[in-house]
Amino acid sequence: MAVLVNGESYSAAEFFAAALREYDAAIVVGEQTTGKGYFQYTYMLPDGSAVGLSTGKYYTPNGVSLAQKGIMPDVMVPVDAETTNAIYAGTLVPEADPQIQAAVKALAEE
């Protein structure tokens, strides 16, 4: 299995990818993740507003914190702004997506 990540992958998404890699269940392909290693709790205030506070820290199954460093992919595949925009617009076909193609190639080589 391959898991695609980038700088928009954070929190539970990056810990999911890290856990799969630590259990040798997946290779990680793409760009470095954000490194948001904390979880928050939202406290409601009497006036109807709210405040979110970090109340804990995530760790991978092997006890590694990704806070402020994220995950470095096994296969690093940076994409330019034009490709990123096409991905988010839904106009990039998988055959032209460099990260998907790198993942397919990496899986074929296993």
What do these predicted regions represent?
Residues 1-88:
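Conserved acidic, small-residue-rich alpha-beta core segments centered on
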Residues 77-110:
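C-terminal recognition in membrane/secretory proteostasis and scaffolding
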